């Protein structure tokens, strides 16, 4: 009896081990349905729930909140990424070439700085960015440069012929101005210069008098934060507004073209207008929301979810409150733009999530109604029609009565 019980225990234990091993190899690849026959939860679980108590600062009409485009990758549509320094654009740029689920993925080969991102139906690029076409319009080209340069560059790369003109969808990332400024300082401190940037505007580059250098020598490595802040020509100041505005409106880099206060006002309003007109923009501080809005805007899906890394080089810089206030003053236009952009970003996210929830509730309701109607059909089919008494049968009953 003891021997038989021992064999039984061994069989059960062996079966359990076999099932465990089988699950380890096959389990991750299995698609198991949710209980009750319901579909598994969608990717909405990846994204933060909108704050129901969020207070809007600015009014935006629905047309500014709705961003569902019919991006035609097989047609003539092109995504143009405006990469502002130290906004997380390098990471986002890699997402575009390595992490988007595509019919024909970008060809990224080890050791090469650029990937080949062809359309599914022809050898022509659908993405204009650092990691696909390189710095074809200059290092970190701004809105003024890109809008005047991109069409010509692509026409030379891929002659249009008789086809319809291309449609360009501009995208960018913004970042908290203080964090971005500190990050740029640390980058310059390590030897970065971006001195090969063209700053092309109205067909010419700025003169040395219009854009004097902040340092002598090959770079500004080792500069202190105070030295970085003291240079009045430092392009780090209000960089995001300058790179998003139409510089032609203010005489490009000629500071004597219009009064300083008027110039600042025109730059800020132009940057806001161009930001609203872009197909998409994200915020470095909200990675998952940025992923969500990009996917819903272009109807493209990322393979792996975005990660929020808050421990950046700027995050490790300890500065006092007076220094932070000074940085905010130097970047006053960027502070105003970011406040505006953050509110628009949050409203777009809230609007789209609410819209999707409403559509999901309608789909669920339609599915329930359809399910109930299908359940009712078999009972109706199996019911036999009642027998109608014949005239002879009724006469027979009456006679007996």
Swiss-Prot record:
<feature type="binding site">
    <location>
        <begin position="307"/>
        <end position="309"/>
    </location>
    <ligand>
        <name>3'-phosphoadenylyl sulfate</name>
    </ligand>
</feature>
<feature type="binding site">
    <location>
        <begin position="313"/>
        <end position="314"/>
    </location>
    <ligand>
        <name>3'-phosphoadenylyl sulfate</name>
    </ligand>
</feature>
<feature type="binding site">
    <location>
        <position position="187"/>
    </location>
    <ligand>
        <name>substrate</name>
    </ligand>
</feature>
<feature type="binding site">
    <location>
        <begin position="113"/>
        <end position="114"/>
    </location>
    <ligand>
        <name>substrate</name>
    </ligand>
</feature>
<feature type="binding site">
    <location>
        <position position="175"/>
    </location>
    <ligand>
        <name>3'-phosphoadenylyl sulfate</name>
    </ligand>
</feature>
<feature type="glycosylation site" description="N-linked (GlcNAc...) asparagine">
    <location>
        <position position="310"/>
    </location>
</feature>
<feature type="glycosylation site" description="N-linked (GlcNAc...) asparagine">
    <location>
        <position position="254"/>
    </location>
</feature>
<keyword id="KW-0325">Glycoprotein</keyword>
<feature type="binding site">
    <location>
        <position position="130"/>
    </location>
    <ligand>
        <name>substrate</name>
    </ligand>
</feature>
<feature type="active site" description="Proton acceptor">
    <location>
        <position position="140"/>
    </location>
</feature>
<feature type="binding site">
    <location>
        <begin position="83"/>
        <end position="91"/>
    </location>
    <ligand>
        <name>3'-phosphoadenylyl sulfate</name>
    </ligand>
</feature>
<dbReference type="GO" id="GO:0048666">
    <property type="term" value="P:neuron development"/>
</dbReference>
<keyword id="KW-0735">Signal-anchor</keyword>
<keyword id="KW-0808">Transferase</keyword>
<dbReference type="Pfam" id="PF03567">
    <property type="entry name" value="Sulfotransfer_2"/>
</dbReference>
<feature type="binding site">
    <location>
        <position position="140"/>
    </location>
    <ligand>
        <name>substrate</name>
    </ligand>
</feature>
<dbReference type="GO" id="GO:0017095">
    <property type="term" value="F:heparan sulfate 6-sulfotransferase activity"/>
</dbReference>
<dbReference type="GO" id="GO:0016020">
    <property type="term" value="C:membrane"/>
</dbReference>
<comment type="similarity">
    <text>Belongs to the sulfotransferase 6 family.</text>
</comment>
<dbReference type="InterPro" id="IPR005331">
    <property type="entry name" value="Sulfotransferase"/>
</dbReference>
<comment type="function">
    <text>6-O-sulfation enzyme which catalyzes the transfer of sulfate from 3'-phosphoadenosine 5'-phosphosulfate (PAPS) to position 6 of the N-sulfoglucosamine residue (GlcNS) of heparan sulfate. Also transfers sulfate to CDSNS-heparin and performs the crucial step modification in the biosynthesis of anticoagulant heparan sulfate (HSact). Critical for normal neuronal development where it may play a role in neuron branching. May also play a role in limb development. May prefer iduronic acid.</text>
</comment>
<keyword id="KW-0812">Transmembrane</keyword>
<dbReference type="InterPro" id="IPR027417">
    <property type="entry name" value="P-loop_NTPase"/>
</dbReference>
<feature type="topological domain" description="Cytoplasmic">
    <location>
        <begin position="1"/>
        <end position="4"/>
    </location>
</feature>
<keyword id="KW-1133">Transmembrane helix</keyword>
<dbReference type="InterPro" id="IPR010635">
    <property type="entry name" value="Heparan_SO4-6-sulfoTrfase"/>
</dbReference>
<keyword id="KW-0472">Membrane</keyword>
<feature type="binding site">
    <location>
        <position position="135"/>
    </location>
    <ligand>
        <name>substrate</name>
    </ligand>
</feature>
<protein>
    <recommendedName>
        <fullName>Heparan-sulfate 6-O-sulfotransferase 1</fullName>
        <ecNumber>2.8.2.-</ecNumber>
    </recommendedName>
</protein>
<feature type="binding site">
    <location>
        <position position="183"/>
    </location>
    <ligand>
        <name>3'-phosphoadenylyl sulfate</name>
    </ligand>
</feature>
<feature type="binding site">
    <location>
        <position position="194"/>
    </location>
    <ligand>
        <name>substrate</name>
    </ligand>
</feature>
<feature type="topological domain" description="Lumenal">
    <location>
        <begin position="28"/>
        <end position="401"/>
    </location>
</feature>
<feature type="region of interest" description="Disordered">
    <location>
        <begin position="367"/>
        <end position="389"/>
    </location>
</feature>
<feature type="transmembrane region" description="Helical; Signal-anchor for type II membrane protein">
    <location>
        <begin position="5"/>
        <end position="27"/>
    </location>
</feature>
